[in-house]
Design a protein with these regions (language model features):
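N-terminal non-catalytic accessory region
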Residues: 1-141, 145-190, 194-201, 316-320, ...
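Secretory/organelle targeting and membrane-embedding segments
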Residues: 147, 156-363
Length: 457
């Protein structure tokens, strides 16, 4: 959801406006997000009604996925690391559509950009400073779903030479094996009425191929003594579209085992993250533990024969073992939406682009995690939880409204096996929780405050 979307028929921006008031209206007004639903024409491939105009330039928010930080700092960092601003192509895409569809658009845009850059006068000058004065090649920097687009564009796209013309790919929080959070989105409200934004997202997500492409493909369905992958029938049972699930399964089967050229994965760690689920009578119960298989595909079990559980954490949305197809990762204690904005992540991007030896950022605070509600009610206390430390010494936690009208401390105290702070915000709006551990990059997450209205389906 990191691209601003524009409705060409109405002339309205339908995702990504720069104020919290728009977010509140989008998630709570009766027709707030109606324009984002895929139409029958769009499902048949007749596109053009909605266009992606640019990358997000202002914070956004969604139930379950929570805060989505803008890409201004990432684009600025990349631009400072290249020979000329014309060497950089920000690629916005309609995230409602399938990975396969957007991958085709990405492959075409990347090829055109490379050919245009190779004709640019600054390219000829830059070659004089490169080993063997070689021609410029592509480097992809991709956050979240963008990494799946890049994988599909380079390994199964229409341009068979694109991978050979690529020097490297840097992914940040990409769910290569999907995310349990996507299943939770589709299942919202199956058991009971839910907050209005959550129900609205479920109805919206049901129409979206892109959301179905983010469903977990690893063994995550807990059936007691057996753990297996979700099938299209399971996805229909939990609230998804079976046809879209079949298409998504075909995509992931095609991409499984494919390697990205020069890949480095930045992976969020230590944040509480959904990793598995049960599905009973159409209701999903998600858990913060996963399961592992031996090299022969057999499930790891304990001495009683029960499946062995592992809490590997993640970035709050994508669990650690889904965020990279290999074990070669750069771990960062950051939330998913902030992975493309934190100072440590931006330093890793700079290092990757400039081909310096990369040892990864300092890991002093790598085990600290933050947990906040995605939606709160103004005037009602709620809790920030901090995991991985047992003392508030050296920690500063604060809450501020993104628009700047409110700011205040969140005083941490000991609460069982973690720290906590009780917070109350005065008015509807988008708020940023910041936990400063003394490391270069603080932990941040966005919370939407809105009236407590229920969606009963």
């Amino acid at each position: 959801m990191g691209s601003e979307l524009y409705d060409t028929e109405s002339g309205d921006v339908v995702w990504g406006l720069a104020n919290a008031g728009w977010l509140l209206k989008a998630w709570t007004a009766p027709q707030g997000l109606r324009a984002l639903r895929l139409t029958p024409d769009e499902r048949e491939g007749r596109l053009g009604r909605i266009r992606a105009r640019r990358l997000l330039r202002t914070p956004a928010w969604s139930p379950f996925l929570r805060g989505i930080e803008p890409y201004n700092d990432l684009v600025a960092t990349v631009t400072r690391s290249v020979a000329d601003p014309e060497a950089v192509l920000p690629f916005a895409y309609d995230w409602r559509l399938s990975v396969a569809t957007n991958a085709r658009f990405l492959a075409e845009a990347a090829r055109e950009h490379l050919e245009r850059w190779r004709r640019h006068p600054a390219h000829a000058l830059a070659r004089k400073h490169r080993v063997d004065e070689r021609e410029g090649r592509l480097v992809f920097v991709a956050h979240s779903m963008g990494g799946l687009l890049t994988l599909a564009a380079l390994t199964d796209g229409p341009d068979g030479d694109l991978a050979a013309d690529t020097r490297g790919v840097l992914t940040l929080g990409t769910p290569f094996q999907g995310a349990v959070a996507a299943a939770a989105i589709l299942n919202t409200g199956q058991g009971a009425p839910v907050p209005l934004p959550h129900g609205r997202l479920r109805r919206l997500a049901y129409t979206m191929p892109g959301l179905h492409d983010l469903l977990p493909t690893f063994p995550c369905l807990d059936e007691g003594l057996n753990i297996r992958r979700l099938s299209p029938t399971d996805i229909a049972d939990l609230g998804g579209d079976k046809d879209l699930a079949v298409d998504s399964q075909t995509l992931h089967d095609t991409l499984r085992g494919r390697a990205l050229p020069g890949h480095r994965a930045l992976v969020g760690i230590s944040q509480p993250t959904l990793q598995s689920l049960t599905l009973r009578q159409g209701v999903v119960t998600a858990s913060e533990h996963c399961y592992r298989e031996h090299s022969d595909g057999e499930l790891m079990r304990d001495e009683t024969g029960a499946p062995r559980r592992f809490d590997v954490g993640g970035d709050g949305t994508v669990h650690k073992e889904s965020a990279s197809p290999t074990r070669a990762t750069v771990p960062l204690a950051l939330q998913h939406g902030a992975l493309a904005q934190g100072e440590a992540a931006l330093e890793a991007v700079t290092s990757f682009l400039e081909e310096d030896e990369h040892l990864g950022p300092a890991q002093a605070g790598a085990r600290v995690g933050i947990e906040v509600p995605d939606l709160v009610a103004p005037g009602t206390p709620w809790t920030v939880r901090v995991r991985g430390v047992d003392s508030p010494a050296g920690l500063d936690c604060a809450v501020e409204e993104v628009d700047g009208a409110f700011a205040g401390p969140a005083r941490l105290y000991g609460d069982d096996d973690h720290l906590a702070a009780r917070v109350t915000v005065p008015a509807p709006g988008l708020y940023r929780v910041t936990l400063d551990t003394g490391d270069p990059t603080p932990l941040t997450q966005l919370v939407l405050a809105a009236p407590d209205e229920r969606d009963d389906g």
